[in-house]
Amino acid sequence: MARSLKTVITNFSAGELNPLLATRTDTPAYINGAKQCRNFSLLAEGGVMRRPGTTYLASLPGESRLIPFVFSDDEIAIIALSNNRMDVYNISGTALSSNVTTNCNWTTAQLFELNFAQFGDTIFVAHRDNPTRKIFRSSATTFEVQEFEFGTDDSVSVGGVDKSQQPFFKYAAGTISVSLSANTTGTGRTLTASANAFTSDYVNQYIEVNGKQGFITGYTSPTVVTITILEDMGSTGPHFDWKEQTISSVNGFPQAVSFHNNRLWLGGVKNRPASVLASRISEYFNFDVGSGAADEAIDLDISGSEVNEVRHFLSVKDLQIFTDGGEYYVPRATDNTITPANVAVLRQTPYGISRTAPLLFDQASGFVQKNGKSIREFVYSDIEDGYKSTAVSILAEHLIDSPKQIAVLKGNATRPEQYAFFLNNGTTSPGTLAIFHSVRDEKIAGWGLWTTRTNDLFQSIISLNEHLVVCVKRQLNGSTVYTLEKFADTDSITLDMKLTTTLNQKGTPLVQGAGQSGASVTIDGFSTAPVINESFTIAGNATEYLIQAVTSNGGTSFTLNLDKSLAATPADNAAVTLTKGFLHNVNTIYRNEQVNCVDGNSSLGAFTVSGTDTITLTTPRATGVHIGFNFIPILETMPIDKELAEGPLTGLPRRISRAIIDLNSTLDLTIKAADKTAKSLVVQQVTFTGGSDLNPVTAKKEFFFLGYDKSPTVTLSQDDPLPMKVLGMSVEVVFAWVLIQLH
């Protein structure tokens, strides 16, 4: 005897769930989750929407790392760093500064290890193997890369060398001393170490002896260098109190950089990995610790049983410090200051961060754990009176694959949702975007995955205010091309790498001969024959004519029969302009590729671009047809299960007999049950007046299925690149009552 029951899926706010949760029917996430949630945006109301497509902006010179430049709401720019090069674009894809190579010291391998901090018109770029750089906007449309240099004190100067305001550190063993040929200021002094301490790389670097500075001008041997003494060093020694530049080509450079509490913070110097350095207040190039006054520079190392490499800073209410071995923060005094006297670094959690920079998202700092398999949020807890690092990806860890970049979108002009995007770079799903939707105050959190065309990969991602921009690695016309693309604000753009066509005018058609009248006209100058159902206008009259028959006169001349008589007698050689046609011009970047075409609410199908950069549509269309690449959204429910008084349905054959899908503004939908014999059903609103566009469906649509399955699911997808929103569904399940009793 068969029985049936109904269950309602009111929302999908938990997103895609780990396959290992397939039998966890007891959890709230199971009820509101999905077996697959691919290429959908989770909505604040609980439904899902086909993810927005992208618009093609520009082609990049190679593999690139995008970084945002945001000066204000109106002044933003996309900075693309590639191998020893920088290019800058506005949000429309227009180049502002191109092929900048001066001072671009990063390599392709280092791109996603670079860290950034912006202050006004300047972005500081840090890497442990490279001297720090500054990207400076010198005018509204001009960007350049400059060397980062510590400040100097020209009141102390000898031989053209000024005293430096940089930090110093004793790297050499404490048993090594130095002696001087003379301790007074002057050039050509000899400094001798008691053991090997120098290489030729030390030339043109500062040294500090007894707290007084000198400048190395020559190298003689591992124990002997020539220096210029800038300040009297007290005696000729030997001196055990001597230091080198903290930051140099010898000892490496900082990899963490941030602005906090009106100071520039540097950290994680390669040979001093636990270092935390802060400039003087409001003097961002002055790292002179001086006497330790409240406004002077800060120089310390994070202490612990292990040396923790400082990888990232994040300036929020506190300065958060992320290392490879744990998470720390620098508390503020009651007067909100951080000074050399009160500075402290407090360890909070022990997980460690990858080289991917953290970002603030939904009141917490999201970061990729060092193992690359977990996303955690570093958030303050009043109950614990400290920070905790909660794993937010635990229900969907299969979607996390060593992310190399994070971007946060805090809503846009049309939707309130905020999303965090994690660009995967592992071996399982490289080039995909794990997307996290969270509303902390409502205890809503869910994951999904975004992909693009098969064999194409997302390469870099940033947000600029409400804009989301990506670099995509695409295979186009047999070559690898890196494209700059911008996600749309809504699902109205349903294609990736979208551009619009222009109607091919088929040469330079002109009216052939004066005095023509009636419902036909002879036109010369066609490079391609006109086709029935194409439309055109003639100069001097706005009337649009539809071609109903075509007669070739030989060469480029054709006589066209029209749907109406000529409104006026056209002049000889009057220009003819096609207004609707089959042949359309496209950007050369699509050459020999198969593209999908969408016009308004109608999907026109897939077409292959010719070697001359044209497509031939099956219906005549005006200029402005959207072309691009389709992507497939998939929403599959968790196995429909139920706990009955007689026992659970888990593992028993059952059939989804009916599903009612709540749709909103949907133009295309395919639906099937999990059974192998189930067929895709299509809903598309086709009740429209000839010549008009399709009408989106906002309604509850009912579907019926056959076939039994032990883990039945409902899968929603699309064949055509058109808008789709699913708010929820009601499912009816039929099962054998006798099996429940036997079970």
Give the role of each language-model region:
Residues D335-G372:
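Catalytic or ion-translocation cores adjacent to nucleophile or general acid/base/metal-coordination motifs
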Residues G62-D73, Q110-F119, I247-N261, S305-V316, ...:
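Structural signature of eukaryotic scaffold interfaces centered on beta-propeller domains
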Residues I76-L81, I123-A126, L264-G267, R311-T323, ...:
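Short beta-strand elements that form the blades of beta-propeller/WD-repeat-like
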Residues A95-V100, V145-D241, S389-L399, N477-Q594, ...:
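Autoprocessing Asn-cyclization modules and mimics
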Residues M1-L96, K134-G186, H239-L314, D318, ...:
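N-terminal beta-propeller domains
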